[in-house]
Design a protein with these regions (language model features):
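Non-heme Fe(II)/2-oxoglutarate
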Residues: 1-79
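Catalytic core of non-heme Fe(II) oxygenases with the double-stranded beta-helix
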Residues: 69-178
């Protein structure tokens, strides 16, 4: 399952969230779990069952509600796919100096889906970093988010610009009808 939610927020909201994340001192090199230090990327954990960074977690929840109230490219309400109850939310940094690792998440948990989008309001297709999910590729546009099954191999394609790409991801409970 891979669904694109289009134009679900304002670019200025993404800019505000990106700025707050950039100014945070809570960044870590925990992920991906089990990998060597050289293969890890920066991650800012906002919610891990409860808020870790209350200010930015609140901003992220505001974004999630905007996504929840939006529709897919085919007109299906995003609210048909998930409950807006966050199990995890984080912001990651990717750049052209590190290839992303193809991986799966929550392999044994069928009740989970993930939502991913970019905080870079100026990101273009030419900048690279498309989202690859199984055999599907989505060029992430600012204000668009993807809802996807994390048990399918996924990763970011090569980034071609010098700019760092900030992505926000939510782990939420899947609705039974999905």
């Amino acid at each position: 399952m891979l669904k694109v939610i289009e134009n679900c927020c304002d670019k200025s909201y993404l800019d505000m969230l990106k700025y707050a994340a950039q100014e945070s001192n809570g960044w870590n090199l925990t992920y991906p779990l089990g990998y060597s230090f050289e293969d890890k990327h920066l991650k800012l954990t906002l919610i891990e069952n409860e808020p870790v960074n209350e200010l930015i977690a609140g901003m992220a929840m505001g974004l999630l509600i905007q996504i929840y109230n939006s529709k897919t490219e085919s007109g299906v309400p995003a609210s048909d796919f998930f409950y807006p109850e966050v199990l995890y939310c984080g912001i990651s940094v990717k750049d052209k100096n590190r290839l992303d690792n193809p991986h799966t998440d929550h392999e044994n948990d069928t009740g989970i889906i993930k939502i991913l989008g970019l905080l870079n309001s100026n990101w273009n297709k030419k900048d690279g970093g498309a989202f690859i999910h199984g055999d599907e590729t989505v060029h992430l546009k600012p204000t668009n988010f993807v809802i996807f099954d994390p048990r399918i191999i996924h990763h970011a394609d090569k980034i071609t610009t010098h700019e760092k790409r900030l992505g926000i991801d939510f782990t939420v409970k899947r609705k039974n009808n999905v």
